[in-house]
Amino acid sequence: RQMCIRDSRRPVLATVLTIIILLFGLIGYNTLGVREYPSVDNPIISVTCSYSGANADVIENQITEPLEQNINGIPGIRSLSSVSQQGQCRITVEFELSVDLETAANDVRDKVSRAQRYLPRDCDPPTVSKADADATPILMVAIQSDSRSLLELSEIADLTVKEQLQTISDVSSVSIWGEKRYSMRLWLDPTKMAGYGITPVDVKNAITNENIELPSGSIEGNTVELTLRTMGQMHTAKEFNNIILKEVGGRVVRFSDIGYAELGPADIKSYMKMNGVPMVGVVVIPQPGANHIEIADAVYQRMEQMKKDLPDDVKYSYGFDNTKFIRASIDEVKSTVYEAFVLVIIIIFLFLRDWRVTLIPCIVIPVSLIGAFFVMYIAGFSINVLTMLAVVLSVGLVVDDAIVMTENIYIRIERGMRPFEAGIEGAKEIFFAVISTTITLVAVFLPIVFMEGTSGRLFREFSFVVAGSVIISSFAALTFTPMLATKLLIKREKQGWFYQKTEPFFEGMNRIYARSLNAFLKRRIWAIPVTVIMLIAIGVLWVQIPAEMAPMEDRSQISINTRAAEGASYEYIRDYTEDINNLVDSIIPDAESVTARVSSGSGNIRITLKDIKDRDYTQMEVAERISQAIRNKTKARAFVQQQSSFGGRRGSMPVQYVLQAVSIEKLEKVLPAFLSKVYDNPTFQMADVDLKFSSPEMRVNINRDKAGTMGATVRDIAETLQYGLSGQRMGYFYMNGKQYEILGQINRQQRNTPANIKSIYIRSDKGEMIQLDNLVEFVESVAPPKLYHYNRFISATVSAGLADGKTIGQGLEEMDKIAAQTLDETFRTALSGDSKDYRESSSSLMFAFILALILIYLILAAQFESFKDPFIIMLTVPLAIAGALIFMYTGGITMNIFSQIGIIMLIGLVAKNGILIVEFANQKQESGENKMQAIRDAALQRLRPILMTSASTVLGLIPLAFATGEGANQRIAMGTAVVGGMLVSTFLTMYIVPAIYSYISTNRNVKTETV
């Protein structure tokens, strides 16, 4: 209290302190980074290893298993997953949020290097990268030309664009979609090879021997030293065609005699188009936790600088930019701050009806809000959706203390007290209430420090900003506000016309409230059933309201994944994807861009819609129309997906349910029954499983006895098939200073049926040519094209899209029921992706909610020196929560992280009203009034400040509850919860709290008399 008195007597000191807060806040605002959400990305390290020609089973046993075995011992791993497929293994190591990304990367590199001695000698060295292999790119630069081939465009994208973009800070990787990388293709003709007695292994050996450049030493003279360079490398198709393979009867056999070499694309089974025009796309993938907007700005800057380096006929555009939504969403929240500020000022003026009195909160609000940016700066936060929502909420909060303080001083001035004395006396009287409400609000957010996982990271920044704003506002209310009040407020001999016109309304409101309160206190027993009804409503509605991690937002982007049956050719999935692309063009002809990308076995179509303000339909409506339309396209399967608010994995549906088993045979047995129940469940719109057992394969069974007697080894047979059919790399060549692969393979036309393999020959140890058909037997079979591990167990992930109106919480409940019905005790289940984040956040939030209630009760008990008074105040909490749930239920709002933030906020907000009433009633008891009269007078005297502070909070959040534009659903969820809770609790608090107070509050009058 001495601080209030001292600062009222020292106005310059109070002003200087306020200016310092403003100055530091402005500095913080101008230096803060901008992003969509706080950094909630778990550190993820990916390990990839290629082994050309090996099937999934070989990859799993020889590469994935040794790598996983070594990586598994690293501390701090949250999940370890892998996929083994034809020619490649990908391991994703997800760490806990507390683990440093660089430390995690170094640990993984160390373990991978130790595991390399267990890997096959001819596999590529494993690569370690600081990102999820399935991470969603944030931006794509589309490279197109009317006159250049995709090979040339790919080279430009690689040498010019990629080289520049991958040096941007916090970029994990830059990939080229639709890339046609140069390679030297050696096409083999098995018939001609048989005629000349040449095998694929001979070709490989010739490349190894004839395409080599080794250090050749030097010639040292007396005055000159010459370095020798043996020009053994080949660079053109002509040189490769002229390679001598052998000599037969005095005639040399060149490669051109048994095949031909050509400069062509390494990947011939992929293409990419944007709006029907072939292209290559350079996509930027950020590191976990990176600032996406800073990366995008750097990309724009680099591309502008690169314009002069690109040929005139090469044009670039941006296929998609996910940061557009982030920027627009942040701008929407910023404009909401201004709207909330204006609405709060209007409500203050309508209640106080004096521009001098209104001016004081007008000055205090910016001080608290700008000061919050300094809190964000010293805490290392960023300007993001949640910190800006915290600022919006703070608009209604920070004004409360200033209003209560100003009104208390103004009442004394109106009674004839001099402004200076009124400032001191008013501040002294209200000091305890201001401190109590501030501590209560800050205590709400203390449990969030203990929250773990994604929700903990998200809540932490939000809570720190609100708590910081409230602390600054209480400091300003106790120092700057009394000083301003003594300078600005004067006793008016006659009120203005607006005051005179509106005063009858407020007097009438006081009379109506006084009469209704007296009537309610005569039947105060009603307070108990009303409270019980509210508690029952909470129990019923909490179960009824669907739950999810975050509401779906209109991000102006839709993705369609296409998949054909296992074993389908590249041409088949290409034609199906183009068919879906044409369908999309007919449904949304005004789309900004439609990008189609196809590779062997799958395709993807990314639709970028016009900005929200430029169209009269939503992303969700378009997604539903496309979903309905593609049901008639039954040649293959297509899945429509929309990006979730949290989580950066591409191609994943919201429900990710992992089945873990001790053997793949058990999974194969149970999956059909499990999937059948998922397909039949109305909660799910679509479903799929990553583990398939339908990929056709031809097994080559070797007759070892026969091979041994004929002088052939298993290695001879395996290498012949490997170099003839798998497209195995035979070496490297250099062109324009860059290294490219030499790929050998039999012509497609001569390996399109199993019978073609019979025409392949191998050479025995006696030099004789043996037809492969004599040594092997071909058996058709099926096998999984990809094998999955999750936390070291063989696994299958069932992915499901949700039906319209269903949430992830309902989906997981149904999955748990299906698992209980179909799986035995040898199976384990786990969650992945968004599902895992949702389940973890739900338990964490409930813990924070309960801890907040306990903390507030204990803090209030300490402040009031009573265990009864805090109980009275805490009764406002169920009233508020019931109000929030009623509004959420009627408004169709889900229980998500934003609405839950609002509900936790309500605990502190509504407790403030209870504190004001109980504190004033206690003061009146101590001044001699009996308990019933004290609570009547306190409630009546606090009516206007409570209504004013509640109205300012509600109006400050009205722009959230009725939000439009980017990110609107998140703001609506939070705004609806807080507005609904405040409206219901404010009305009921004015009756329930006095009634319960009259029952159980300590009789302080008696205590005073005793003393």
Label for each model-derived stretch:
Residues 1-5:
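Short, small-residue-biased leader/transition segments that mark boundaries at the very start
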Residues 12, 20-55, 78, 113-123, ...:
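Transmembrane helices with small-residue packing motifs
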Residues 25-31, 36, 342-411, 418, ...:
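Hydrophobic transmembrane alpha-helices and their membrane-interface caps
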Residues 395-409, 431-450, 457-499, 605, ...:
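Transmembrane alpha-helices and their membrane-interface boundaries in multi-pass membrane transporters
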